[in-house]
């Protein structure tokens, strides 16, 4: 991703050739590959026909399952209210054994993201129930007996997975799988429900530090849009195909425009936060100076400014920004941002 002059902000989906490589210009930056941390980029790259093999390899590697074949299914479900007519997953698919996989990219923090995953799992069970009931009715068999196939709700989190905070060191720092179990013995219910949270925010390895295919998958998903080439260490591995599929030049104009709108919307939100932060700084400065106190004025100004910044940082986090995103905007260390949001 490189800076480039952008004369129009109307989404056009057009490509430019630079040294034999096609890039898309969005808000003055060059993108060779889609940003997979955005819902739209994630769905276009991993949720369209032709991506089944890539998605299969990704899930097998991160979940430790043995998927042989995947089939995309409709990602729409009836909504809870008249205003919200449908719930839409990023990706919904089944394997040949009937196991269901709901895959979501969550770019903004949500207070109840864990409960949202539970809700999505219930929709997958409901879908299996309806299909099985209809099948057995056609075959003149008895009603469905609640024996649903395994289901996985896989959430890629571009914010901190707070469910892991304070936990003992895990063998896998980035992928957490939850199942129903007895609270005293830990024995699993074995109903087939799997809630998987993949913490991209916690993953901070460089490409040179990636020493496994799992690391390469996580690195590539998190940093795809920043690349101009497929890294040497990724070439020849199962992850290389992800780079080929994510090339914007290989997408339709409609897909590129959709992705461009998504990037612009995110940039607008981030710019709004930056403006709010600057306004808070000026407001605090004016308030302290207006008090006209000769003694302790400098100290009061510093304290007031810090208080104002802390307030804005908390607002940014409440509205769904990750710790890393906030740190990038306010130009402060990640650990300091973490401490402020926990105050």
Regions found by a protein language model. Name each.
Residues 2-31, 101-106, 208, 215, ...:
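Short, charged alpha-helical interaction segments and adjacent helix-coil junctions
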Residues 182-200, 212-224:
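Low-complexity, glycine/alanine/valine/leucine- and proline-rich hydrophobic stretches
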Residues 167, 171, 210-211, 222:
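Intrinsically disordered, low-complexity regions enriched in Ser/Pro/Gly/Gln/His and often acidic
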Residues 39, 52-56, 148-151, 211-218, ...:
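Non-catalytic, well-ordered alpha-helical scaffold segments
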Residues 1-194, 204:
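Accessory alpha/beta interaction modules
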């Amino acid at each position: 991703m490189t800076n480039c002059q952008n004369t129009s902000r109307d989404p056009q989906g057009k490509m430019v050739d630079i040294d034999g490589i096609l890039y898309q210009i969005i808000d003055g930056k060059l993108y060779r590959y889609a940003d997979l941390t955005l819902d739209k980029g994630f769905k276009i790259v991993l949720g369209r026909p032709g991506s089944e093999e890539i998605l299969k390899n990704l899930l097998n590697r991160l979940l430790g399952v043995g998927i042989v074949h995947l089939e995309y299914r409709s990602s729409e479900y009836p909504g809870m209210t008249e205003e919200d007519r449908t719930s839409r997953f990023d990706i919904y698919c089944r394997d040949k054994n009937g196991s269901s996989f709901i895959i979501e990219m969550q770019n903004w923090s949500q207070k109840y993201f864990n409960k949202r995953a539970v809700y999505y799992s219930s929709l997958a069970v409901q879908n299996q129930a309806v299909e099985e009931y209809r099948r057995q009715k056609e075959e003149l068999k008895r009603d469905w007996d609640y024996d649903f196939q395994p289901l996985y709700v896989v959430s890629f989190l571009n914010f901190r997975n707070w469910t892991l905070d304070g936990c003992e060191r895990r063998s896998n720092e980035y992928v957490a799988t939850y199942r129903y179990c007895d609270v005293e013995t830990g024995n699993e219910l074995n109903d087939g429900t799997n809630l998987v949270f993949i913490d991209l925010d916690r993953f901070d390895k460089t490409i040179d530090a990636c020493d496994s295919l799992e690391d390469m998958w996580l690195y590539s998903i998190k940093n795809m849009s920043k690349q101009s080439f497929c890294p040497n260490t990724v070439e020849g591995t199962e992850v290389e195909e992800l780079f080929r599929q994510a090339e914007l030049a290989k997408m339709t104009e409609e897909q590129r425009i959709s992705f461009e709108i998504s990037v612009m919307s995110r940039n607008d939100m981030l710019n709004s936060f930056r403006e709010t932060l600057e306004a808070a700084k000026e407001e605090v400065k004016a308030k302290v100076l207006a008090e006209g106190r000769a003694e302790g004025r400098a100290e009061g100004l510093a304290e007031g400014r810090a208080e104002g910044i802390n307030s804005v940082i908390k607002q940014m986090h409440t509205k769904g920004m990750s710790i890393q995103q906030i740190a990038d905007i306010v130009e402060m260390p990640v650990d300091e941002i973490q401490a402020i949001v926990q105050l």
